[in-house]
Curated annotation (Swiss-Prot):
Residues 656-677 are annotated as: MPER. Disulfide bonds join C44-C57, C101-C214, C108-C205, C113-C166, C227-C257, C237-C249, C305-C338, C390-C444, C397-C417. GO terms for biological process: clathrin-dependent endocytosis of virus by host cell; fusion of virus membrane with host endosome membrane; symbiont-mediated suppression of host innate immune response; symbiont-mediated-mediated suppression of host tetherin activity; virion attachment to host cell. This is Envelope glycoprotein gp160. One of its GO terms (molecular function) is structural molecule activity. Keywords: AIDS, Apoptosis, Clathrin-mediated endocytosis of virus by host, Cleavage on pair of basic residues, Coiled coil, Disulfide bond, Fusion of virus membrane with host endosomal membrane, Fusion of virus membrane with host membrane, Glycoprotein, Host cell membrane, Host endosome, Host membrane, Host-virus interaction, Inhibition of host innate immune response by virus, Inhibition of host tetherin by virus, Lipoprotein, Membrane, Palmitate, Signal, Transmembrane, Transmembrane helix, Viral attachment to host cell, Viral envelope protein, Viral immunoevasion, Viral penetration into host cytoplasm, Virion, Virus endocytosis by host, Virus entry into host cell. Residues 574-590 are annotated as: Immunosuppression. The record marks R510, G511 as: Cleavage. Specific enzymatic cleavages in vivo yield mature proteins. Envelope glycoproteins are synthesized as an inactive precursor that is heavily N-glycosylated and processed likely by host cell furin in the Golgi to yield the mature SU and TM proteins. The cleavage site between SU and TM requires the minimal sequence [KR]-X-[KR]-R. Palmitoylation of the transmembrane protein and of Env polyprotein (prior to its proteolytic cleavage) is essential for their association with host cell membrane lipid rafts. Palmitoylation is therefore required for envelope trafficking to classical lipid rafts, but not for viral replication. It comes from Human immunodeficiency virus type 2 subtype A (isolate BEN). A motif (YXXV motif) lies at residues 706-709. Residues 511-531 are annotated as: Fusion peptide. Residues 1-22 form the signal peptide.
């Protein structure tokens, strides 16, 4: 029984020690390299801040370094706040540049229109027949820069744009009178009862909005980059095989700004993109057939569009403050045309080969059965035609000839590009009327860098169509789809065995390397334990970066505060500044509510909420740990706040006691007021005690049958003094115990009363003295008893220590015996396994020999 008791005692002792020393407490870390996805507004930076669209942007000095992170992150170009903001912002810039000012009432009036007849004999392109000429060869379909037809505007397929001359009645400045106005419309923009003459209306007049251009801003190219506000950052997937959707990208870099991008608004093709490389690659939607194909810049693909002829614009006043721009045209303006240059056939063949090699592609591998096709019939003009904008004019180009050309098929004619004023909005549902276009001759030359397309695979997988698309937003999936916006969360929780924070100042080592605003993110791929030692420098770097970016934003806002209404960037700059300040103040308020203000490592008294959840300080990163404990942050935060409130209460009570440590505080004026209060309380207590004693004495005398002499009413003075012989024995009195009080009869009753009070107080003090003396007399036995108890406890502890030592030796011997038995068992098992494996191997090696012997026996 004795060894069993010793073992049980050892187990209980070890368990108690583990409970005391192995408890885990919440520790707050500030400056950890962790983040979460965010969706806050970005702001822009550009080198050219002289244009109207980028005047609110920060100056771009190309000082945007990227830091490699040793982490794995998910990227999605279609579920991405960066690309969504780019689409929204470019749309607002587009709207502002083309029509930044006044909304006019839709021109839904009946117009008497007739077709404009030109002075030339050029056939109407709508009625021209393809049988008037033989199908040209592919070489003849290319217009060179030196062709005479370009200078003379007589190239094949280049005709006049059909116009309609219309008249309508409307009130002008004089509201009581109607005036008749004349206007010229493109034939495609009006709907008439009769194609030659009759009543016509502006197409989509009930769903269109006319917006006038104030300052002749046109949709010119603008280059800028997005930057994250302070406290946020941008991650980029640097994997070469990234195709728009990657749940586990291993090559991740951190940056404060994106690459430089250029505004694009077109269908079918993307122009002047910044992602073109010496290869063709495809961004493919994760759950759809939508793609954006980046073309190889080696083939030098270009498109040059031109609108020849003169064009003038004449304003017509409809009413006060409302002006409609008419187009008086002496001769019909010529249609626009576009010429494609470069090695297009080779580029399109490489697109097909890249599609076949794409991991998402499940169709036929024969590139000869992969064709480029146009969208189906019945689509909007922006879908059916290639739509682009050339300095104010909206061109709709029929690309049938282009598809035949790149597929090396015979073509019947080369089509032109229509010019329209009423177009469908590419970002929102609706139609807009854009007025006025730029006067004079227009020419645009762009580099074709991408194709917007849908991959349509036949059910039987016999052929595949690459269908051109009108999703303008896909252009920005390619430009910014490899970025994602994150919010840096520098506050983290982790369990440690330290319960209190040590306020001992620590001297920082010399030569701390400051990494910059994103420098601490470079440690995101390192272990938690290694990075906890550098949190001080990281938090200082984070704060310095926030302050620096705040100052830059504030300078821009101050310089351009009178022009914030012009573009979307002014509002974004203000919002980015406010967001950064709110984020920093929120973090400091949180740390302060937990009692951890301005501390990098703050130990608390709050126990860790989940003992089974513990970090691997040597192998786990802070980002991995934060993903595991993110659901516990609310409970931990609440517990820390409650602990801090209790700590403040304890500190308040402790400070009240500390005020008595200094002798000077005892003589403070405020202390004397307290002393007076204490004195009043003592006097009141004495009076109450005397009243109680008086009542007790009165009751005692009543029990003895006496009526006290001093019970007479106040103010009564005895005139007859009773002189009693002091020498008379006590037993001669008429009452018992009267002799003891004979001394009080010599005085009148008030003096007797005072003597009685003094006598009672003396007896009270003597009683207290006797009690204290008795207690002190009993102190010696108590001391002897305490000494004996301490001796017994010491002997008991020595006995238990000996038992603990014996138990430890017994456990050590048991472990040694267990290890010896295990080693012998494993050695025997290994020998048996080795013998069995050897026999099986010999049997397998003997199989061919047995087969040969069996065959020989069978042949015999």
């Amino acid at each position: 029984m004795e060894p069993g008791r010793n073992q049980l005692f050892v187990v209980i002792l070890l368990t108690s020690a583990c409970l005391v020393y192995c408890s885990q407490y919440v520790t707050v870390f500030y400056g950890i390299p962790a983040w979460k996805n965010a969706s806050i507004p970005l702001f822009c930076a550009t080198k050219n801040r002289d244009t109207w669209g980028t005047i609110q942007c920060l100056p771009d000095n190309d000082d945007y370094q990227e830091i490699i992170l040793n982490v794995t992150e998910a990227f999605d170009a279609w579920n991405n706040t960066v690309t969504e903001q780019a689409v929204e912002d470019v749309w607002h810039l587009f709207e502002t540049s083309i029509k930044p000012c006044v909304k006019l009432t839709p021109l839904c009036v009946a117009m008497n229109c007739s077709r404009v007849q030109g002075n030339t004999t050029t056939p109407n392109p709508r009625t021209s027949s393809s049988t008037t000429s033989r199908p040209p060869t592919s070489a003849a379909s290319i217009i060179n820069e030196t062709s005479n037809c370009i200078e003379n505007n007589t190239c094949a397929g280049l005709g006049y744009e059909e116009m309609m001359q219309c008249e309508f009645n409307m009130k002008g400045l004089e509201q009581d009178k109607k005036r008749r106005y004349k206007d010229t419309w493109y034939l495609e923009d009006v709907v008439c009862d009769n194609t030659t003459a009759g009543t016509c209306y502006m197409r989509h007049c009930n769903t269109s909005i006319i917006k006038e251009s104030c300052d002749k801003h046109y949709w010119d190219a603008m280059r800028f980059r997005y930057c994250a506000p302070p406290g946020f950052a941008l991650l980029r997937c640097n994997d070469t095989n990234y195709s728009g959707f990657e749940p586990k990208c291993t090559k991740v870099v951190a940056a404060s700004c994106t690459r430089m991008m250029e505004t694009q608004t077109s269908t079918w093709f993307g122009f002047n993109g910044t992602r073109a490389e010496n290869r063709t690659y495809i961004y493919w939607h994760g759950r759809d057939n939508r793609t954006i194909i980046s073309l190889n810049k080696y083939y030098n693909l270009t498109m040059r569009c031109k609108r020849p002829g003169n064009k003038t614009v004449l304003p017509i006043t409809l009413m006060s403050g409302l002006v409609f721009h008419s187009q008086p045209i002496n001769t019909r303006p010529r249609q626009a045309w576009c010429r494609f240059g470069g090695r297009w056939r080779e580029a399109m063949q490489e697109v097909k080969q890249t599609l076949v090699q794409h991991p998402r592609y499940k169709g036929i591998n024969d590139t000869g059965k992969i064709n480029f096709t146009k969208p189906g019939a019945g689509s909007d003009p922006e879908v059916a035609f290639m739509w682009t904008n050339c300095r104010g004019e909206f061109l709709y180009c029929n690309m049938t000839w282009f598809l035949n050309w790149v597929e090396d098929k015979n073509q019947t004619r080369r089509n032109y590009c229509h010019i329209k004023q009423i177009i469908n909005t590419w970002h929102k549902v609706g139609k807009n009327v854009y007025l006025p276009p730029r006067e004079g001759e227009l020419a645009c030359e762009s580099t074709v860098t991408s194709i917007i397309a849908n991959i349509d695979i036949d059910k039987n997988r016999t052929h595949t169509n690459i269908t051109f698309s009108a999703e303008v937003a896909e252009l920005y999936r390619l430009e910014l789809g490899d970025y994602k916006l994150i919010e840096i969360t520098p506050i983290g929780f982790a369990p440690t065995d330290q319960r209190r924070y040590s306020s001992t100042p620590v001297r920082n080592k010399r030569g701390v390397f400051v990494l910059g605003f994103l420098g601490f993110l470079a440690t995101a791929g390192s272990a938690m334990g290694a990075r906890s030692l550098t949190l001080s420098a990281q938090s200082r770097t984070l704060l310095a970066g926030i302050v620096q970016q705040q100052q830059q934003l504030l300078d821009v806002v101050k310089r351009q505060q009178e022009m914030l209404r012009l573009t979307v960037w002014g509002t974004k700059n203000l919002q980015a500044r406010v967001t950064a300040i709110e984020k920093y103040l929120k973090h400091q308020a949180q740390l302060n509510s937990w009692g951890c203000a301005f501390r990098q490592v703050c130990h608390t008294t709050v126990p860790w909420v989940n003992d089974s959840l513990s970090p691997d300080w040597k192998n786990m990163t802070w980002q991995e740990w934060e993903k595991q404990v993110r659901y516990l942050e609310a409970n931990i935060s609440q517990s820390l706040e409650e602990a801090q409130i209790q700590q403040e209460k304890n500190m308040y009570e402790l400070q009240k006691l500390n005020s008595w440590d200094i002798l000077g505080n005892w003589f403070d004026l405020t202390s004397w007021v307290k002393y007076i209060q204490y004195g009043v309380h003592i006097v009141v207590g004495i009076i109450a005690l005397r009243i109680a004693i008086y009542v007790v004495q009165l009751l005692s005398r009543f029990r003895k049958g006496y009526r006290p002499v001093f019970s007479s009413p106040p103010g009564y003075l005895q005139q007859i003094h009773i002189h009693k012989d002091r020498g008379q024995p006590a037993n001669e009195g008429t009452e018992e115990d009267v002799g003891g009080d004979s001394g009080y009869d010599l005085w009148p009753w008030p003096i007797n009363y005072v003597q009685f009070l003094i006598h009672l107080l003396t007896r009270l003090l003597i009683g207290l003295y006797n009690i204290c003396r008795d207690l002190l007399s009993k102190n010696s036995p108590t001391r002897r008893l305490i000494s004996q108890s301490l001796t017994a406890i010491r002997d008991w502890l020595r006995l238990k220590a000996a038992q603990l030592q014996y138990g430890c030796e017994w456990i050590q011997e048991a472990f040694q015996a267990f290890a010896r038995t295990t080693r012998e068992t494993l050695a025997g098992a290994w020998g048996w396994l080795w013998e069995a494996a050897r026999r099986i191997g010999r049997g397998i090696l003997a199989v061919p020999r047995r087969i040969r012997q069996g065959a020989e026996l069978a042949l015999l």
